[in-house]
Amino acid sequence: SSRVLKVDCLDLPAKVYIRRDVSLTPEQVKLYMQMKKLALAKLESGELATTASVLTQIMRLQQICCGHLQPDDGEIQTVKSNRLNELLDITEEFQGKAIIWATYTHDIQQVADALRDRFGPESVATYYGATPQDERQQIVEDFQDSDNPLRFFVGQPKTGGYGITLTAANTVIYYSNSYDLEIRLQSEDRAHRIGQSNKVTYIDLVSPGTIDEKILGALRSKIDIAGQVLGEDVQDWLR
């Protein structure tokens, strides 16, 4: 209800949602099916008895959609993906500044490197757990300054999604989504708040027929996924 009141009171511009489909590569399909089979076997054997264990399997499936996999031993395995090229295509379709949210550190670094290669080193800043505290405010100020060449704010929603104002952007791209509804809502509001005079366009990158689609569907329906995955729905999430 407070969200409705916010719009009523502040008369903020509209939010527009766009979904961009990204097909999996054959390598991703193979790895995804293996991981899904493993997750369902663990479910059958009773290994996935906690919310955390189910969310870990969901996270691994999502990582594969993004083009990498980080198993328990921590060694990141990369897999050929179309997602980065799709993102670069999107950046050619709009003018002005943009926020790009990504759940995984590996993706933040890959996205930032690709954008720097295309648009120059001054055009990109990253904002996530490893960003030094004393640099964070300057990044926000530079981004908000229309004369500053910083065009792309590439961040992790759980780090940059709260409390900061990024109204210089009216394009927000979700390279990957958090399964935490509150993090999604808060990260949307970095651009959509007092000071925003333009409509804000939210673009979600989604691999059809995968966990991506289920996560986005739940978020759009304002469902907190962590509260959903342990009941009878758990098989649906992993199928």
Where are these regions (language model features)?
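SF2 helicase motor core recognition
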Residues: 7, 108-112, 151-176, 180-199
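Short glycine-/polar-rich loops that comprise or flank the Walker A/P-loop
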Residues: 15-17, 120-123, 167-171, 196-202
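Helix N-cap/beta->alpha junction signal
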Residues: 80, 103-106
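Alpha-helical elements of the RecA-like P-loop NTPase motor core of helicases
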Residues: 30, 85, 109, 113, ...
